[in-house]
Amino acid sequence: GLPPTTEQLLTNASYEDTVDQLLASPHYGERWGRHWMDVWRYSDWYGLGGMLRHSQKHLWHWRDWIINSLNKDKGYDRMIQEMLAGDELDPQSREAVTGTGYLARSYYVFNRNTWLDATIEHSAKAFLGITMNCAKCHDHKYDPISQVDYYNYRSFFEPHHLRLDALPGETSFDKNGLPRA
């Protein structure tokens, strides 16, 4: 999270205790969550007037999920599972379902294909460390991903649809909702 303060360095606490104290701080998740949010392309809501365009209102729930997951020492593999399939892993768990904000974050109201293409592009870069953009249209001479591979990968995301659920106790999504896949 944050580097130790001068006071923390001057105490008689051991190095290990100071590190444990810093890792237990909620600032740890805030600091490192910021880096993961860059990788996973987190962006707050924006639209035109009241109309949703490229992201989701209340996507801050997903941002907080990232921070809390890091602070709880949730494994990276579990975080990825919840981001891609939290609604299937544990549909009754709000925490697991909130992870699917990853899929909702790049929602594009005008064209589902644009949303799917962006999700494929972001997922391949973030989780596989490769680009798949060229393979959408053709096999590339030097890339290991063929056009068939691209559409096989896309088939994983095809069943996903966006849901905009009001949270328990709220009367509408606009007041406080949970964007999810």
Placement of each model-derived feature along the sequence:
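Short, structured secondary-structure elements
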Residues: L2-A181
